[in-house]
């Protein structure tokens, strides 16, 4: 079995995963660059009980520990859905102090922005999740007032990488690590508009992997495994 996105825990399975913990940590790192004085953050979580939600939340918590100038003022469940996120944020906003940033898990950004706008609250820096409506909103705000943020998420096309990993296993490769970490897809102020141009209305940014890219990903993870083994063996 080759799994992707979510995690299969059986040792015999292969797992193609994004470093979701780093993803959460990088959300706070980016906010720290733009908001050196810190402030209150609103966290929008994903589906409760999933490994992805736990990992991203853990990364966000680690980022806040490294940057104590920030504090999580409140946390709501957005379930990776714009409408759900908008309702959840709208419900909690009246009880919150000024929010300087919104950290989330992808797909919540546009809903959060709509909630702040409807409540006539000052727009915080909202981390986006690579969806077309989020990036389009970001583009509009950038043109209007120079709005700056960061966007990241797993690429739906990671399923193609899992396919090629399965093909390599069936082709007889015995050296493929059972845990394969691949980069998440991220955009910044300089390149998100180019990505937006290629995303259909209602869609999400993605990348389809080739066989060669899959082989490079496998080799990169093999090197990581070898380096960890070497480090462990070098310890007294």
Question: Where do the model's predicted regions map?
Answer:
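Solvent-exposed loop/turn segments at secondary-structure junctions
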Residues: 1, 7-10, 47-51, 78-82, ...
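Flexible loop/hinge segments that line or gate small-molecule binding clefts
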Residues: 1-22, 26, 33, 40, ...
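Periplasmic-binding protein-like
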Residues: 1-4, 42-43, 73-76, 96-106, ...
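Structured segments of extracytoplasmic/periplasmic soluble domains
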Residues: 4-7, 30-38, 63-67, 88-95, ...
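Stable alpha-helical elements in mature extracytoplasmic
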Residues: 23, 27, 52, 56, ...
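An alpha-beta-alpha
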Residues: 25-70, 74-75, 166, 173-198
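Hydrophobic alpha-helical
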Residues: 60, 78-138
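Hinge/cleft segment of the Venus flytrap/periplasmic-binding protein
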Residues: 63, 154, 163-236
